[in-house]
């Protein structure tokens, strides 16, 4: 009995040692960030290795259009998913209170399919019943994963942040579901935007952006946008992101494609 107990104890200790060794070999935690510009930059940089992403979007507020009155945006929903290496994606917009608008779109490498319900169908030449197929041009230029191109884009992004009349602010850290997140806010007026790009079309209003960045991998977890304008009121948009899931996108059956 004593010998058997000793063997069990040795086996237990060996197993525990393996478990502890595996835990110790895990990727160390990333260093904490305090500079809001650095958080924004690392959040953008984290996208270079992105494989799959799922996005959901919701809206608040209403917009007033000539001859149409106020359109409630609280029922508008967006969902999207993309497999970056697989070159496939899907997107849907459901806006029942915006003149019954609905958009469904699929992307498979060099072919895209879409169908549209509502007034936009006439403008885009689509159908509410069947998918319209269009060819997608092959990408030109350097891919975003090209090291030199990526470094150039990051430098341009940092330069843009340095030009902001009102710099971004780091707010208190928050929970994003089960993730610990940094919270960075950015507020701009129409005058700020004009200062950034004097050639841009004049806009009257205030804009705010709140970015919630996951601490463990720097990926964006949530983005909240808000626009306030005299002739528009206040419109809000919130986008939630998930990563690493399986994304399935298939071409529509032949009988569901418009001739």
Language model features by range: what are they?
Residues 2, 24-259:
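Subset-of-secretome marker
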Residues 19-22:
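C-terminal motif of bacterial Sec signal peptides marking the signal peptidase cleavage site
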Residues 1-13:
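Bacterial N-terminal signal peptides that target proteins for export
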């Amino acid at each position: 009995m004593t010998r058997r107990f000793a063997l069990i104890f040795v086996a237990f200790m060996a197993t525990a040692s393996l478990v502890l060794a595996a835990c110790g070999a895990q990727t160390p935690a990333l260093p904490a960030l305090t500079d809001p510009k650095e958080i924004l930059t690392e959040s953008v940089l984290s996208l270079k290795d992105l494989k799959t992403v799922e996005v959901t979007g919701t809206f608040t507020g209403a917009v007033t259009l000539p001859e149409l009155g106020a359109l409630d945006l609280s029922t508008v929903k967006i969902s999207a998913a993309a497999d970056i290496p697989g070159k496939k994606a899907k997107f849907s917009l459901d806006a029942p209170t915006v003149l019954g608008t609905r958009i469904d779109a699929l992307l498979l490498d060099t072919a895209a399919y879409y169908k549209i319900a509502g007034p936009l169908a006439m403008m885009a030449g689509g159908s509410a019943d069947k998918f319209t197929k269009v060819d997608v041009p092959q990408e030109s230029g350097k891919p975003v994963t090209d090291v030199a191109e990526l470094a150039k884009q990051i430098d341009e992004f940092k330069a843009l942040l340095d030009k902001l009349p009102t710099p971004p602010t780091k707010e208190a850290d928050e929970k994003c579901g089960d993730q610990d997140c940094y919270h960075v806010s950015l507020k701009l007026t129409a005058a700020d935007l004009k200062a950034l790009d004097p050639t841009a079309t004049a806009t009257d209003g205030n804009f705010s952006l709140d970015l919630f960045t996951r601490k463990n991998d720097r990926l964006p977890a949530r983005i909240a946008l808000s626009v306030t304008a005299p002739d528009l009121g206040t419109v809000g948009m919130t986008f939630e992101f998930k990563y690493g899931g399986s994304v399935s996108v298939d071409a529509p059956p032949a009988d569901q494609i418009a001739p």
